[in-house]
Design a protein with these regions (language model features):
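Conserved beta-propeller blade signature
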Residues: 38-40, 78-81, 126-130
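Residue-level detector of Asp-centered blade-edge/turn motifs that repeat once per structural unit
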Residues: 33-36, 73-77, 116-124
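A short helix->beta-strand "capping" segment at the edge of beta-propeller domains
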Residues: 1-27, 53-57
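Blade-loop segments of beta-propeller domains
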Residues: 53-89, 98
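Asp-box/WD-like beta-propeller blade repeats and closely related beta-sheet repeat scaffolds
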Residues: 88-126, 131
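Structural motif
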Residues: 47-50, 86-91, 135-146
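Conserved beta-strand position repeated once per blade in WD40 beta-propeller domains
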Residues: 30, 70, 112-114
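Surface loop/turn motifs at the tips and blade-to-blade linkers of beta-strand repeat domains
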Residues: 20-24, 61-65, 102-108
Length: 150
């Protein structure tokens, strides 16, 4: 069973998931668990998101136009997926595997590297994106689906 490790009111930073999969993976670069306890994996080599239930049973996949690198899921059950080769972030419904929106960074020297979540059981969680732009490493926050760069 996928299980988020948290004490009520504490931030959630990880989970314990011990399962064996009988699936032909490329290269898994990101993992997150939805509010429905489904496991979402980024397969960088095969350009897809994979969905498994909490027992490790394959449910579905979403083919993508390029390689997904990382994923984080907000308290509102929205998955944010970074796709560095397209310089974009996808918002995905993690349980239905459908793309809700796509944010593209137009600056030619921008590299989207990672996404992470800071979740709380008592307040809305924050999603952060790490990226390099113009030679500078930066972080941006996503609040209610809007990317905020300070």
């Amino acid at each position: 069973m996928a299980q988020v490790l948290a004490v009520p009111g504490d931030r959630r930073h990880g989970f314990d998931f011990k399962r064996s999969f009988s699936h032909d993976f490329g290269r898994i670069t990101g993992i997150a668990v939805s509010n429905e306890n489904n496991v979402l994996l980024c397969d960088y080599i095969k350009n897809q998101l994979l969905l498994f239930d909490e027992e490790g049973n394959y449910l579905n996949y979403l083919p993508l136009t390029s390689s997904p690198w990382d994923v984080a899921i907000s308290n509102q059950n929205t998955a944010f997926v970074t796709m560095p080769t397209e310089q974009c972030i996808l918002q995905v419904d993690p349980d239905k595997l459908c793309i809700c929106s796509k944010t593209v960074f137009e600056h030619p020297n921008t590299f989207i590297s990672c996404v992470s979540s800071e979740m709380s059981t008592t307040e809305p969680g924050n999603i952060y994106v790490g990226f390099v732009s113009g030679g500078r490493s930066m972080a941006a926050q996503i609040m209610e689906g809007v990317l905020i760069i300070k």
